[in-house]
Amino acid sequence: MTVLEIDLLDETKKLPDEDKQLVENILQFAAEYLKIEQGTELSLTFTTNEGIREINREYRDKDQATDVISFALEEMGDGETEIDWGEFDLETPRMLGDIIISTEKAEEQAKDYGHTKARELGFLAVHGLLHLLGYDHMEPDEEKVMFGLQKEVLDAYGLER
């Protein structure tokens, strides 16, 4: 069963189809595991270190490449007006937001951590999804919950370190 509608864009034009499919499969599995509503949407973009660096600089004031960035539509930022989802009809799908992954950073980290690129891409995708769902790791207690759930999902899928 397909829970998520994923709008996937590979800006690198280099990511093998099997890697894209793996990430989509992991996100679908995670969505079912986390009991996300059927028909929920998100966008997933694969980019380069330079591409994610530009986004990181523009939106987070950090002039460096990172592995994954998530933009949650359901999260309120400073000065933003809360969306009243009750105004929309029941046919309007839930849109979680955007996950952006640097494939170059994923390859670097896979080598550093001694596991496969597939495992790293899966980890980053689930990490991004959890951010879209409101999980964070700014505080030690939040980190414990988020990273524990991340490991639980990846282990249940069979993508262990």
From Swiss-Prot:
Gene3D superfamilies in the cross-refs: Metalloproteases ('zincins'), catalytic domain (3.40.390.30)
GO molecular function: metalloendopeptidase activity; RNA endonuclease activity; zinc ion binding
Cofactor comment: Binds 1 zinc ion.
Function: Single strand-specific metallo-endoribonuclease involved in late-stage 70S ribosome quality control and in maturation of the 3' terminus of the 16S rRNA.
UniProt family annotation: Belongs to the endoribonuclease YbeY family.
GO biological process: rRNA processing
Stored SUPFAM superfamilies: Metalloproteases ('zincins'), catalytic domain
rRNA-binding found in the keyword field: no
Name of the molecule in the record: Endoribonuclease YbeY
GO cellular component: cytoplasm
Main location group: cytoplasm
EC number: 3.1.-.-
Residues the entry annotates as binding Zn(2+): H127, H131, H137
Pfam family, one: YbeY
Cofactor needs: Zn(2+)
Alphabetical keyword list: Cytoplasm, Endonuclease, Hydrolase, Metal-binding, Nuclease, Ribosome biogenesis, rRNA processing, Zinc
Taxonomic lineage from the root: Bacteria, Bacillati, Bacillota, Bacilli, Bacillales
Compartment list: Cytoplasm
Record keyword Endoplasmic reticulum present: no
